[in-house]
């Protein structure tokens, strides 16, 4: 059975200040060994306090998710541009007797339209994953044998005892999974469930023993396009490939990458890493190793200037027996797009994944049609929602107007300089060259530089 008694708020001992956390503790007996109880903790400090439990449950999953590690969640809560730190973080802990068997890192947030209606604002509150964006399929943490009952216990608690929300949403969920099924099973007269379309994730299963073997698995047309553009690139000047791994080595290239972002097609769009100072700080902490990911960087230089770069994160250190890599951010110089530096980056990323024995290389979301050419298979997902029938979210979901207007407003704000010209001037080139030189001056471990001769050996095609 599932125990769901009312709760009271108790401060967490030893925690104070702006990151003060609270525990919602159950009153009464927890019941016999077969009963499940759901408790909740609030605040950023709770992520630190319960870090060992969060990470233990993550490793118990079929596929450990670095975006659900305690380090990533804490970094997201403190640095993400989307939310204010210390507001709305809420971690639900599911126990069987005294044993913790499940965890759901979540947050409460108010939609913009909810702020316009005064005392009815609570009807516009959304309860969602703590880190819903810039992640891979966020959800609950539990061992495979516990997933169904943990999901059921969580949904029962949220529907019966967690007050003041209009929509419960889990983004990026595969249909048919335990969490997805539990949300739909909770639908009744008070709540309705729906699947909202979402862009698929794309992922390469790393099954090749070498970069050459992978390259040969691509279509003849794809191989021809990649090799032809690479030869054009190498004919344009002095090309050098950069491979960096580890916090210090990748950090040395971060400012160069941010400058490159301003010379890419992303300049002035919502896709730019520089669209918000908090976003820059968020990724700076990721590459510095502060988010639980092992940072990696792949770069292409032409005549002493970085013209393409890819930031990668892996979970090899946290999960040495079952690890993969995720492409986090990528950019290339738009003025040199005809040389195909972006294509070369993706090829090199697959090669690095093979070298490191990753089980998969994830390209995240968007542009699935293009990523499929690289043997990346789509992972179809939906944003599964449970909507309180008497809520602003329900009205918005039926009408669809408020959300579209708000989304368009956000895009307008983020893309005011969408027409900005990313074509570099002579001064831009000089600045880029200086930043690249500063990165090259890093003399610590973790960096490989391949000149033309080494590239002839490394690449699976003729570059001359």
Q: In which residue ranges do the predicted regions lie?
A:
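Hydrophobic, well-ordered secondary-structure elements that form the walls
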Residues: 304, 342, 346-349, 353, ...
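Hydrophobic pocket-lining residues that define ligand/cofactor binding sites across diverse proteins
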Residues: 158, 162, 290, 353
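Conserved acetyl-CoA-binding loop-helix of GNAT-fold acetyltransferases
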Residues: 146-157, 338-350
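ATP-hydrolysis module of ASCE/P-loop NTPase motor domains
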Residues: 148, 159-177
């Amino acid at each position: 059975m599932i125990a769901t008694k009312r709760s009271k708020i108790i401060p967490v001992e030893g925690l104070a200040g702006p990151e003060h956390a609270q525990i919602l503790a159950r009153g009464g007996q927890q019941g016999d060994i077969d009963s499940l109880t759901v408790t909740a903790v609030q605040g950023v400090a709770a992520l630190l306090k319960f870090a060992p439990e969060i990470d233990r449950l993550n490793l118990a999953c079929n596929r450990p998710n670095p975006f659900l590690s305690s380090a990533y969640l804490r970094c997201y809560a403190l640095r993400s541009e989307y939310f204010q730190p210390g507001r709305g973080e809420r971690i639900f802990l599911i126990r069987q007797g005294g044993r913790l068997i499940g965890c759901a890192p979540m947050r409460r947030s108010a939609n913009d339209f909810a702020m316009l209606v005064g005392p009815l604002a609570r009807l516009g509150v959304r309860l969602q994953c703590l880190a819903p964006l810039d992640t891979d399929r966020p959800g609950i943490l539990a061992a495979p044998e516990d997933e169904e009952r943990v999901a059921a216990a969580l949904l029962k608690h949220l529907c019966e005892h967690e007050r003041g929300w209009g929509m419960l949403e889990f983004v990026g969920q595969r249909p048919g999974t335990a969490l997805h099924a539990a949300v739909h099973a909770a639908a009744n007269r008070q709540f309705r469930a729906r699947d909202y379309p979402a862009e698929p994730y794309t992922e390469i299963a790393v099954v090749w023993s070498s970069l050459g073997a992978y390259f040969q698995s691509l279509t003849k047309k794809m191989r021809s396009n990649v090799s032809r553009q690479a030869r054009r690139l190498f004919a344009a000047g002095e090309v050098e490939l950069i491979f960096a791994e580890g916090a210090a080595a990748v950090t040395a290239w971060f400012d160069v990458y941010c400058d490159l972002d301003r010379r890419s097609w992303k300049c002035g769009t919502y896709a730019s890493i520089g669209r918000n100072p908090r976003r820059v700080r968020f990724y700076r902490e990721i590459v510095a190793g502060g988010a639980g990911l092992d940072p990696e960087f792949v770069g292409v230089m032409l005549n002493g200037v970085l013209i393409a770069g890819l930031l990668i994160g892996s979970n090899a250190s946290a999960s040495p027996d079952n690890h993969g890599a995720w492409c986090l951010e990528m950019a290339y110089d738009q003025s040199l797009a005809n040389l195909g530096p972006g294509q070369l980056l993706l090829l090199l990323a697959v090669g690095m994944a093979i070298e490191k024995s990753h089980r998969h290389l994830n390209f995240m979301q968007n542009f699935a049609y293009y990523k499929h050419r690289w043997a990346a298979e789509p992972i179809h997902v939906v944003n599964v929602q449970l909507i309180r029938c008497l809520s602003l979210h329900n009205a918005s979901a039926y009408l669809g107007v408020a959300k579209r207007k708000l989304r368009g407003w956000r895009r307008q704000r983020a893309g005011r300089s969408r027409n900005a010209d990313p074509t570099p001037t002579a001064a831009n080139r000089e600045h880029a060259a200086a930043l690249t030189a500063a990165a090259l001056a890093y003399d610590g471990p973790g960096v490989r530089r391949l000149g033309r001769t080494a590239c002839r050996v490394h690449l699976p095609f003729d570059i001359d």
